[in-house]
């Protein structure tokens, strides 16, 4: 009972969720029962005749069941199809581990349907085990022990199942650089010790088809020789792909399939083939010829994801038997490949039988429930209720660990369609097992109404009644098929009910009857919809104090605009009509530079409230008023002859007043200083002018010329005097130097250039004697 409690809680949660969803229904643009069913899981359709009133749309028929009942629709007339699930149990005596085998679902859009799938782990289920071994030179000791494993492997399988078979295959790597040495001698014997007999390298060789003959296993494996390659990673993924893609060649039965992958190193994967100029992606197909993968140099290595998909598709559970240094690497690989296990292999593979037994027990005690590829319109989730008391809900796949023999576990599968789907099917299976559940999916979008007939009295003899709504014959339209199209298409008639091509018919608020909009009656009290295209109403206007247009005493709403009473104004009739707060001292509204709205000045750009009297940022028109200032004050200038006409708007003030100071030249070049005072209105100024003009006298030409000439002459004379003084000082300095040299001179009678013609030579021997 305790184990069933999570299931009961989940079912209660689902019912509560559906109850919440059933309280909502979006019925916009709904005209048929099918449209209603598609619009939401909480919608229902009332097929009662004459359920809609005058001017009401057919979408009124679509609502939640509670709302339809409250509107007077009898419960028998409410169409509310539900999602359903029908299951067919397996035949008695069948060894199927999954039940049921077939499920038929009728899916309504947005409404989930749930059904249970039970898995019961069978005892002694048949097993096929394929031993795939790395024959690179580093595995030479392992091969010796594997050659003796045939009997031990079969005995181990027979301890688990009544029917076990074993097979064998081997791999090295692609036979191109840089994976193997392509020197002809090295291709014949790739082993480092030339005296040792080795076989040429190869990608994958299928040695023995799955069999229950242990002697044959030992015989065929005993013929195998070690090989070799260059780099550390091996081509194991290539070999695994061929084992999964060639079921007939390998001899797989429709039973539990185990693939033991034995190696002491890593693996190449997609993209590594480019190192050997192999660019074509792996196609995931079988390419065995004479039990050899001869196309390995044409296709790149498979990706891990590609291999995982192929293994799952073929129901193959890999067991990675690897040495201690590679355990962590292959544990990462098992995180990507579902239903796989890793075991630590001894250096000489002595423990491989025990490793396989432990890995099988680990794999068979965990169950993953998954489904085949689905379209985007279908969503499948799983709730797992495991035998160990643990549960998971709303997961992308079912998952239970610690599964025991003959102890059932339950998965609740929930399927939801996002729209009305086409009839289709998919399969659910436990990964690594051959049993499947076939799920057939059909749409649940039609209403089984009772009134489908051609009763002439209902639709005027021009149509049939379907779910309470008339479906008119060709040439007639209208709620009761009362309108004859007279050769016009329905598109043409609908076009006259659209404001423009981008708008919807009758603004979505009316029905197009004979090319004219008949507006709906609104559910909102006192709301009236009107207009040629039903585009207007009497409530969608601005509100003041919580009421449309401030209430009926202030104004009424007409098609989005408030029409105010004579005493009120404003976009929402929020203001009394008054200008008292907008008048300046002279009684001018907003100083003539703005408009009074709601008793507040709305000033022209630049002018400041409250009365629009100042404009700090506006330029002062000093230059523009200079001619009028000159003629008004001094009776001269360009406007002297018609000053009163040209400057009639400008008043000359006799006393100084505060305003904008100006200083401009008059027509004679004199400076005028005056003050502009702005009056009410725009560009209207009074002016006060200072009495005195600032006139600058002309320059003295003679003084300027005389001074210039005199200055040039004086500069020339000064330069000559300086030059003369400098030359005199230089001559004086040279004269004094000459005098000093003269005093130092000593004269005699000898000619310093004369040399005597007589030469005297002394004999050194003569001196000694």
Curated annotation (Swiss-Prot):
Question: Which amino acids does the record list as binding Mg(2+)?
Answer: 136, 138, 234
- List the carbohydrate attachment sites: 50, 116, 254, 501, 642
Which intervals hold domain VWFA?
A: 124-363
Q: Which GO terms describe its cellular component?
A: cell surface; focal adhesion; integrin complex; membrane; membrane raft
List residues, modification Phosphothreonine.
Answer: 758, 760
Membrane topology term reads:
Single-pass type I membrane protein
Q: Where in the cell is it found?
A: Cell membrane; Membrane raft
GO BP terms: namely: cell adhesion mediated by integrin; cell-matrix adhesion; cellular response to low-density lipoprotein particle stimulus; integrin-mediated signaling pathway; leukocyte cell-cell adhesion; neutrophil chemotaxis; phagocytosis; positive regulation of leukocyte adhesion to vascular endothelial cell
| PTM comment | Both Ser-745 and Ser-756 become phosphorylated when T-cells are exposed to phorbol esters. Phosphorylation on Thr-758 (but not on Ser-756) allows interaction with 14-3-3 proteins.
Residue numbers covered by motif Cell attachment site: 397-399
Q: Which residues form the I-EGF domain?
A: 449-482, 483-535, 536-574, 575-613
Subunit = Heterodimer of an alpha and a beta subunit. The ITGB2 beta subunit associates with the ITGAL, ITGAM, ITGAX or ITGAD alpha subunits. Found in a complex with CD177 and ITGAM/CD11b. Interacts with FGR. Interacts with COPS5 and RANBP9. Interacts with FLNA (via filamin repeats 4, 9, 12, 17, 19, 21, and 23). Interacts with THBD.
Free-text comment on this protein's domains from its UniProt entry = The VWFA domain (or beta I domain) contains three cation-binding sites: the ligand-associated metal ion-binding site (LIMBS or SyMBS), the metal ion-dependent adhesion site (MIDAS), and the adjacent MIDAS site (ADMIDAS). This domain is also part of the ligand-binding site.
Write the protein's name: Integrin beta-2
């Amino acid at each position: 009972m305790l184990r069933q409690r999570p299931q009961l809680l989940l079912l209660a949660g689902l019912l509560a969720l559906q109850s919440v969803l059933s309280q909502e229904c979006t019925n916009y643009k709904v005209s048929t029962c099918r449209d209603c069913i598609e619009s939401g899981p909480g919608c229902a359709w009332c097929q009662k005749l004459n359920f809609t009133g005058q001017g009401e749309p057919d979408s009124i028929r679509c609502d939640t069941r509670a709302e339809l009942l409250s509107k007077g629709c009898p419960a028998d007339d409410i169409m509310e199809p539900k999602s359903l699930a029908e299951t067919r149990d397996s035949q008695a005596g069948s060894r199927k581990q999954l039940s049921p085998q077939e499920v038929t679902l009728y899916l309504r859009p947005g409404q989930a349907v749930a059904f249970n799938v039970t898995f019961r782990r069978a005892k002694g289920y048949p097993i096929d085990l394929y031993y795939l071994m790395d024959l690179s030179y580093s595995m030479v000791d392992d091969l010796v022990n594997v050659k003796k494993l045939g009997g031990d492997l079969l005995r181990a399988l027979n301890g688990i199942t009544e029917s076990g078979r074993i097979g064998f295959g081997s791999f090295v790597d692609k036979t191109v650089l840089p994976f193997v040495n392509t020197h002809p001698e090295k291709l014949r014997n790739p082993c480092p010790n030339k005296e040792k007999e080795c076989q040429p390298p190869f990608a994958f060789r299928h040695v023995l088809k799955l069999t229950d003959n242990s002697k044959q296993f030992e015989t065929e494996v005993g013929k195998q020789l070690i090989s070799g390659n260059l780099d550390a990673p091996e081509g194991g993924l290539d070999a695994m792909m061929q084992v999964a893609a060639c079921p007939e060649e390998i001899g797989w039965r429709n039973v539990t399939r185990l693939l033991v992958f034995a190696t002491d190193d890593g693996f190449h994967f997609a993209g590594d083939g480019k190192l050997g100029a192999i660019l074509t992606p792996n196609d995931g197909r079988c390419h065995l010829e004479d039990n050899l993968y001869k196309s390995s140099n044409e296709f790149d290595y498979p990706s891990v994801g590609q291999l995982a998909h192929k293994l799952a598709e073929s129901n193959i559970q890999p067991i990675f038997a690897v040495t201690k240094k590679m355990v962590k690497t292959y544990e990462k690989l098992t995180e990507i490949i579902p239903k796989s296990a890793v075991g630590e292999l001894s250096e000489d593979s002595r423990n491989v039988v025990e490793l396989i037994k432990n890995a099988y027990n680990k794999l068979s005690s965990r169950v993953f429930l998954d489904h085949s590829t689905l379209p985007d319109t279908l969503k499948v989730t799983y709730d797992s209720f495991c035998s160990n008391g643990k549960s998971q809900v709303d997961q992308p796949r079912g998952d239970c660990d610690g599964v025991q023999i003959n102890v059932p576990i339950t998965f609740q599968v929930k399927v939801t369609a996002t729209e009305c789907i086409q009839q289709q099917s998919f399969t659910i299976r436990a990964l690594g097992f051959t049993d499947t559940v076939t799920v057939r999916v059909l749409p649940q979008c039609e209403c089984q109404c009772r009134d489908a007939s051609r009763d002439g009295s209902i639709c005027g003899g021009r149509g049939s009644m379907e779910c309470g709504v008339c479906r008119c014959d060709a040439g007639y339209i209208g709620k009761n098929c009362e309108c004859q199209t007279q050769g016009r298409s329905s598109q043409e008639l609908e076009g006259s009910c659209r404001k423009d091509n981008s708008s919807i018919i009758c603004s979505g608020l009316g029905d197009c009857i004979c090319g004219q909009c008949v507006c709906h009656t609104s559910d909102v009290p006192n709301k009236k919809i009107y207009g040629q295209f039903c585009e207007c109403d009497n409530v969608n206007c601005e509100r003041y104090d919580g009421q449309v247009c401030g209430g009926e005493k202030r104004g009424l709403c007409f098609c989005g605009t408030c029409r105010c009473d004579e005493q009120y104004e404003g976009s929402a009739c929020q203001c009394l009509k008054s200008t008292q707060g907008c008048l300046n001292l002279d009684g001018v509204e907003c100083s003539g530079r703005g408009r009074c709205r709601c008793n507040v000045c709305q000033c022209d750009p630049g002018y400041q409230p409250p009365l629009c009297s100042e404009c700090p940022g506006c330029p002062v028109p000093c230059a523009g008023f200079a001619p009028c200032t000159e003629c008004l004050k001094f009776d001269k200038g360009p406007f002297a002859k018609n000053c009163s006409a040209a400057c009639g708007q400008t008043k000359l003030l006799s006393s100084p007043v505060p305003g904008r100071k100006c200083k401009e030249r008059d027509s004679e070049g004199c400076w005028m200083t005056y003050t502009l005072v702005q009056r009410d209105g725009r560009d209207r100024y009074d002016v006060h002018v200072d009495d005195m003009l600032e006139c600058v006298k002309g320059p003295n030409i003679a003084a300027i010329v005389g001074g210039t000439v005199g200055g040039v002459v004086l500069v020339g004379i000064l330069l000559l005097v300086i030059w003369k003084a400098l030359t005199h000082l230089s001559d004086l300095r040279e004269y004094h130097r000459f005098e000093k040299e003269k005093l130092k001179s000593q004269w005699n009678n000898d000619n310093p250039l004369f040399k005597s013609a007589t030469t005297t030579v002394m004999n050194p021997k003569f001196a000694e004697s």
